[in-house]
Amino acid sequence: MEEGGRDKTPVQSQQPSATTPSGADEKSSGKERRDAGEKDKEQELSEEDKQLQDELEMLVERLGEKDTSLYRPALEELRRQIRSSTTSMTSVPKPLKFLRPHYGKLKEIYENMAPGENKCFAADIISVLAMTMSGERECLKYRLVGSQEELASWGHEYVRHLAGEVAKEWQELDDAEKAQREPLLTLVKEIVPYNMAHNAEHEACDLLMEIEQVDMLEKDIDENAYAKVCLYLTSCVNYVPEPENSALLRCALGVFRKFSRFPEALRLALMLNDMELVEDIFTSCKDVVVQKQMAFMLGRHGVFLELSEDVEEYEDLTEIMSNVQLNSNFLALARELDIMEPKVPDDIYKTHLENNRFGGSGSQVDSARMNLASSFVNGFVNAAFGQDKLLTDDGNKWLYKNKDHGMLSAAASLGMILLWDVDGGLTQIDKYLYSSEDYIKSGALLACGIVNSGVRNECDPALALLSDYVLHNSNTMRLGSIFGLGLAYAGSNREDVLTLLLPVMGDSKSSMEVAGVTALACGMIAVGSCNGDVTSTILQTIMEKSETELKDTYARWLPLGLGLNHLGKGEAIEAILAALEVVSEPFRSFANTLVDVCAYAGSGNVLKVQQLLHICSEHFDSKEKEEDKDKKEKKDKDKKEAPADMGAHQGVAVLGIALIAMGEEIGAEMALRTFGHLLRYGEPTLRRAVPLALALISVSNPRLNILDTLSKFSHDADPEVSYNSIFAMGMVGSGTNNARLAAMLRQLAQYHAKDPNNLFMVRLAQGLTHLGKGTLTLCPYHSDRQLMSQVAVAGLLTVLVSFLDVRNIILGKSHYVLYGLVAAMQPRMLVTFDEELRPLPVSVRVGQAVDVVGQAGKPKTITGFQTHTTPVLLAHGERAELATEEFLPVTPILEGFVILRKNPNYDL
């Protein structure tokens, strides 16, 4: 085809110049050609067509005559001709084509007719004809004055055309002109059921969205169409502004409830973040099996409902929602996959593959920094497996290979290994609580918090163990216990925990770091709840701090706590932004931007992204400042306080673009392109933040283009860009065991063998890549990427915002912040149970998810599938469906824990 096209073009361009030297000739030749064309056209008409054309012309003439008795039969005949013309999909039906030249004449005839049935008939015919004319909505105009007979008789194309005109007309009428909207509504009430019955559900939805009457859908939907309609509505949510998006979700939710599809309705209620509605859906369902399935969904999303004890199977439901069985189910999967054998960091580094000239990297093996890296790697790789080779056998030996804060993080990594195992885990950590070293004790406290992350326990062991240390004399002890509480109760909005923590911020003994961590912990506990006490306490703390204190790098956690408290709440932050106006620069811009981006997290709000791009394009005169900064840093390397940086909020803006756009794919693609520009042309502050933004937009989804970009910048001249790029590579591939990434990181480890900081980052990235031996994910989205877990986003943000000052926080003494990732860790598995919650292995097909929105029929939802037996792992962008007819899933999205029922129609 292409070649043909290529051959044609030169011929066309030569034609006029070869045949017609002057412009005048060209015109005349054009005219001749047209005349010839018309003659051909007449010859082209076959006998039948000629007969039809004459017949139609005769009918039109008959309507122009004086004899009114002939009108009726003439109109009847015209109507019959138009209707009976079987139309092909690509061309205009013949009668309409031949009647087109008579359109004006027919309108005149209509105007001159006496009112009555004939006039209405004529209006109907003109309305259908108007489809072929690009007129001023005449199709609709004549329909409204026509005979009002049913639409279906004129065919689908006519209905579609009419719907388009109704939508345009509606938008031009104001609310004042209600009377004129009535006839349009009547028409809509005819169009919608017609579309529903003829597989054009999405057209019905579009029309109702245009005229803002989505609620009308509910009564026209039948059992066969509801799934498609709701899929279409929920897919549109990303592309409509507030408050229409919630209206669409509520409409789809109403439809699901009408057909008693409780799990689907619950998912939408969670998208709306409306807890009363969630509770209402949960309690109004009377089927215990479905309730258990919903409890699994709530547990995965980190929502716990206080049920009344007289609910049937109260204990089971509470246990499922509390994620009590998460650990045992995860270990069952590990046994199934045969990966229980603990791994040591060297299995991950694969040092034997490095072709070092000096035979292994022997010289610097036992440095404290490398041991710290190994503690993290060991924790990440064996996360939730409950056993390892460094800490669970004889931990003291390993702990004392670390120094000071290194001991804190090393002890805390034990919590990660025992993740979710509250009963068994705490007994193993207990012995370290009696250590003589404050750092080890503090790490053990943090470990207690980590073990409880995402799991609720009646006895509240985390609160009981950690509460005594929150106001301890030693700030080190405070850090472990406060951050531990933040992780253990993230997303619970528990008042008793918050009342315990809030006073610490204002306590005179609290260092800036402790105040920051407290704000962070409170933000995580109250995530997305707009808790008034948290807001006022953090604001008060910010107001009370002096300008010098706010320049401390840990001050960044105060506004982050505020932002997390309002995560995804949109406009609810106006008052806070106003309150922050009194704070001095540069902290004010930093805090404002941070709170603002948190409020719109995952919303895909394009206008916000535009504002953030404006912030990124501001230019500060930073030449002198950069020089000062270098001198100052040489002078006081040990001093934590980095000089005030006017562009600090730009880094947050870059992260914010990723945070807002990560919710939907088109936005994420566009953000990706923007990041490319920023990396090439941005200021240093921007460039340091871009790798982190790339990590956030593609967590646990190792796309090659992103990995290549990060790999390029992992050799950047600015050390902070390279630190962040290397860590981002780990985030992008977290829990995937991606072989290509693992090879890249091994090469980097060789390249940076002499640079302890970069090597530390490479080790962290290697640990993350093999997170949970490849069974866990950090991606905050689940349920087919529809639901965003706020707790997971809070954990990721905590880490990424800290990485904006990687040198003083992560490579300084506060690497324990990396345990914020625990809040985002989730197994990426699919486990199936029978109605009694016994594991039920069935065969499932796992393949790449295909978007089937608005497609006719029942298209395949996955492609390139393989058949496995559950439990199975699901990678990013994969979807599973049952490969057997024997069972029916209680929820349509097979992810996490799914209950199956016997199919009553299955014949053995």
From Swiss-Prot:
What ranges does the record list as Basic and acidic residues composition bias?
24-51, 623-643
A Pfam family the protein falls into: RPN1_RPN2_N
Q: Which GO terms describe its cellular component?
A: proteasome accessory complex; proteasome complex; proteasome regulatory particle
Keywords linked to the UniProt accession: Acetylation, Phosphoprotein, Proteasome, Repeat
Q: Where are residues bearing Phosphoserine located in the sequence?
A: S29, S147, S361, S363
Residues of the region (Required for interaction with UBLCP1) are 708-903
Q: Which residues form the signal peptide?
A: none
Q: Which domain of life is it from?
A: Eukaryota
Q: Which residues carry this modification: Phosphotyrosine?
A: Y194
Q: What's a GO biological-process term for it?
A: regulation of protein catabolic process
Phosphothreonine: residues bearing it: T9, T20
**Biased amino acid composition, Polar residues:** 10-22
The PTM N6-acetyllysine maps to K551
Q: How does it assemble?
A: Component of the 19S proteasome regulatory particle complex. The 26S proteasome consists of a 20S core particle (CP) and two 19S regulatory subunits (RP). The regulatory particle is made of a lid composed of 9 subunits, a base containing 6 ATPases and few additional components including PSMD2. Interacts with RPGRIP1L. Interacts with CRY1 in a KDM8-dependent manner.
Family affiliation: Belongs to the proteasome subunit S2 family.
Name the job this protein performs: Component of the 26S proteasome, a multiprotein complex involved in the ATP-dependent degradation of ubiquitinated proteins. This complex plays a key role in the maintenance of protein homeostasis by removing misfolded or damaged proteins, which could impair cellular functions, and by removing proteins whose functions are no longer required. Therefore, the proteasome participates in numerous cellular processes, including cell cycle progression, apoptosis, or DNA damage repair.
Q: What is this protein's name?
A: 26S proteasome non-ATPase regulatory subunit 2
Source organism per entry reads: Mus musculus (Mouse)
